[in-house]
Amino acid sequence: MQQLRSAIHNAIARFLKNQPPARIIAVGFALLILLGAALLMLPFAVHPGAHVSPLDALFTATSAVCVTGLVVVDTGDTFSLFGQAVIAILIQIGGLGVASIGMGLALVAGRRISLKGRSLVREALNVESLEGMVRLVRAILLMTLICEVAGAALSFPSFARDHMPLQAVWLSIFHSIAAFNNAGFDALGGGQSLIPYQNDLLLNLVTDALVIVGGIGFMVILDVGRCRGQFRRMTFHTKVVLSTTAVLLVGGAVLLHLTDHMGWLAALFQSMTARTAGFSSVDVGSISNAGLLVIMILMFIGASPGSTGGGIKTTTFFVLMQQVRSIFSKRRLGGFHRRLPDGSLSRAATIMLMGLMVVGCGTFALCVLEPQLDFGRLLFEQISAYSTAGLSTGITAELCPASRVVLILTMFIGRVGAVTLLSLWVERPAPSAQYTEENITIG
């Protein structure tokens, strides 16, 4: 038995050694989803009398691991405490990343971190250097623990007013994990998300803070701490993320206030949660078409690199907007007295184009499969799945099995990254002869 175990371990080690980090991460997410689905299908994972089909379990596990929040069955009404705990763990691992959690467990066990392990974490966190990777993971795990414990403690008074003490404790923990990891799950039951708490100032502000901190990226948080909040000392990346986040947050709130006459607290909350969090303090299905368009744009842009959120990312949006500005101002691409590298625009454009292609193909498939549903609602659902936002106009549970599979694939692509997945399985062509350059008319 020991020899068999050693042989299997060596075979896995040899296999992983020859695989690029991004492929290992993608496979790791897929295996975690399958494991989560299997656990959610256990009889004691659901309430007595409730039933979860294999597809529903797979959808829920995918939504949790990809920190989305779209659901086909209500989390609180369907899943038992065990099932909800499984979902919370999947959210936590999915938000921080399989590689980061794996390194954290290895550090706790006192094991040495290999170069391959450090490369996996670098790929997962989207950082440039391998230097200080162990210290970085320790800081991220500690920061996550502090934020989630503080969030749970501050959320408790709001939930304690409507629930028994022990249940309020669990709801606070579950909500804090979901909010920090930008996953729109709630265990309240009734399918209302946070609508009953739309006027609860404390819970709204705590949720806002958790979502924003989780969505701006771990490197940004550490840089803000290093600079003690002094904006001029921060890195170019941090300045871009913070300024773009502020513009989107305030701009989205103003537009939602104007289009749907939301109160400022609700508009601010909805603008924040649209960018990949998935919570809702208003009925999304009742929002006007103009308001839905604002939310779709915010969802598509999403969070920031190296964070728990999805979308094309705030930095991509910044680069594209700077390119538009540079066309009219005739200035070089950049900002904050810094010039962007030449490859930044092509990468941003590729990410944007791939995102539009995934959303377009997915929406087309949903339109074919669900001809009875409104195009705008199907587009909203697809963007929500791709950006791992988790907001819905209320049609998720009505979708046919094939449509649910489309959303499962979209959520997975959105979490791992369309460009990353494409680069893993598309072989690079061998260098060919250089051809003569010639212009074409564009626009």
Where do the protein language model's features map onto the residues?
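Membrane-proximal intracellular helices of multi-pass ion channels
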Residues: M1-G443
